[in-house]
């Protein structure tokens, strides 16, 4: 069901649609708000449970990984578990449809996201991730990508062990880290 909009907002939407219809290249930037509707917490939301005593800078920076890689890995394992069962919402699907239909017109719709989840891809979009991707890993030393993680392994709570031994790179023995900046 569509939300009821005021006449002023409807007029703005119609104007935007008219202006965008005549453009050949459109670039859309999305952020946390689009995935929040699917139940994914944003960085502005208060951390919950085990993580409420940590700031983002304690968990989501290269310095944090250098200081305490097991803590950072534990947090990312938790984040993966939070995201694993989430599905795209109508906004994700609308953008995917827009991209799909643009292929048969003279429009190019480029989608860029600040999000690290894969909800745009699940909806069918081609997307560029500015800050990395939650399901990819890479070596902290030589930057070689490590095989992608399966989201299905994270759906059951008992599949996550926070005390797992750190994975080392087969090329240089550096630690594997989440591919997120």
Indicate residue ranges for each PLM-predicted region.
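Conserved catalytic core of sirtuin-type NAD+-dependent deacylases
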Residues: 1-181
